[in-house]
From Swiss-Prot:
One of its GO terms (biological process) is cell division. The keyword Signal applies. The gene is tolB. It comes from Methylococcus capsulatus (strain ATCC 33009 / NCIMB 11132 / Bath). The keyword Cell division applies. The Tol-Pal system is composed of five core proteins: the inner membrane proteins TolA, TolQ and TolR, the periplasmic protein TolB and the outer membrane protein Pal. They form a network linking the inner and outer membranes and the peptidoglycan layer. It holds the Pfam family TolB_N. Residues 1-24 form the signal peptide. The lineage of its organism: Bacteria, Pseudomonadati, Pseudomonadota, Gammaproteobacteria, Methylococcales. InterPro entries: 6-blade_b-propeller_TolB-like, PD40, Tol-Pal_TolB, TolB_N. HAMAP family: TolB. Part of the Tol-Pal system, which plays a role in outer membrane invagination during cell division and is important for maintaining outer membrane integrity. This is Tol-Pal system protein TolB. It comes from the Bacteria. It is found in: Periplasm. One of its GO terms (cellular component) is periplasmic space.
Amino acid sequence: MNKARAIARWISFLLLIAAGQVCAELQVQISQGVEGAIPVAVVPFANQGSLSDSLSQIVSADLQRSGRFRTLAESAMQERPTAPDQVQQAAWQALGQDFVVVGQIRPSGDGYEADFHVVDVIRGTLVVSYRLPFGRAETRQAAHRIADVIYKAITGEPGAFATRVAYVSVSGEGANRRYNLQVADTDGYNPQSVIVSNEPIMSPAWSPDGTKIAYVSFESRRSAIYVQTLATGERRKVSDAPGINGAPAFSPDGSRLALTLSKDGNPDIYVMNLGSGGLTRITDYSGIDTEPNWSRDGRSIVFTSDRGGKPQLYLVSASGGPAERLTYEGDYNARGVFSPDGRSLAMVHGKGGDYRIAVMDLASRAVRVLTSGPLDESPGFAPNGSMILYAARRGQLAAVSIDGKVRQSLRIEGGAVREPAWSP
C-alpha cells in the first residue's frame, strides 16, 4: 500500500468531527439515574453568606448529577443544622432522607476552611468528618472535592467530581471554521481553551499526573503531535514525521508516548521515549494499526487493526512482538481503553451499521453493550471507573455508568463537541 493511500484510509478510518456554533459552557443533564437512588440532604453550610450557599449548591448538584443520589431541595428543609449534634434524626427520616450533610465555613489565612460532616440518620451514626482548606478563588473546586469525600463516605468508591474533561469544540463554516481544544470541570463550568486553530485538532490525551495534554494538530496543513503544559501553555512538538502522526497515549508513568506513525509506509504503532525522543516500532503490518492505549501496568498496549479484514482490537507487548486478537463479536471494534482496575476494556462496538459503546471483560471476553448508538465513539473511563464518557451523534458528549443504569448528556447550546478525554 503506498503512503498516499494509507493516509487516505487512516483519515477515513478515524476522522469524525462535526461542526456547529459553540457557546461558553457544557450543559450537563441526567437522562437516567439509578432506581432507588440514595436520598441525601446537603444543608447550606453556616457562615460566609453567599459563599456558603454557592458551595453547598455545587455539592448538591454534583451528587445529584452522579445519578447515584437524590438530593433534597433546600426549600423542603425544615431545619438548618450546622453540626452533627444538631441533626434531629426523626425529623430527617420523616423527610425520607438517609443521610444529611452539615458544615461551616470559616476564614483561614488568605482563604477559608470548610468543616463538614456526613450523618447517617437511619442508623444515627457519624459517617465522616472532614476539614478542607481552600483559596478565595477556589470555591467550585473545593465543592467538587467535598462532593468526592461525601461520595466515597457513602458508597465506598472514590468520587470523580474534582477531575476535568478535555474535548474539541467546532464552530463556524468553511473558511471561518474554528477548532478549539478545551478543558472544563466535569459539570461543564470553567471552560479554558488549550489551543484554537483553523485546522482540525484531534485525539487529546492526558498525562497521568493531569498536568499535560498530548494532541494531534493539523495547523501546518499536515498532522503533528504536541504535548502542552496546561498551567503555562508551553507546548512541544514531539512528532512531525512524514505522513501520519496520530493517536497519542501516555504510558502510566508518563515517560513514554504510544502513537501511530506512517513514516515507514503504513500506519503502525510506535512508542516514543519523551526524554530522549527515541522511537521503538511496536507493530509492522501492511494495513492499518492505530489507536494505542496502555494497560495499567504499562506492559501491554491495546490497539485497533484491520489485519483481520475489519477493525478489531488486538493486544501486544509494549516492547513489541506478536499481537493477540481480543475481539470477535461484531463487525467493528475500535478505540479500546483499559478500565482503571485493568479488568475490562471500553470500546466502540459496531454491528449492523450501529456503533455503540461496549465493555469487554478481559477474563471472560464477554461483551456488554451500554449505549443505544447509532454513532457513539471515543470512550474513556472516569478515573474511579464508575462512568464512561463518550461522543454521541449530533455533536454532543454523553456518559454512562459501567452497569448502564446511569446516563448523562453534556452539550453546548447550538454547537458541537467531540473527542472527549477524562482527566486522571
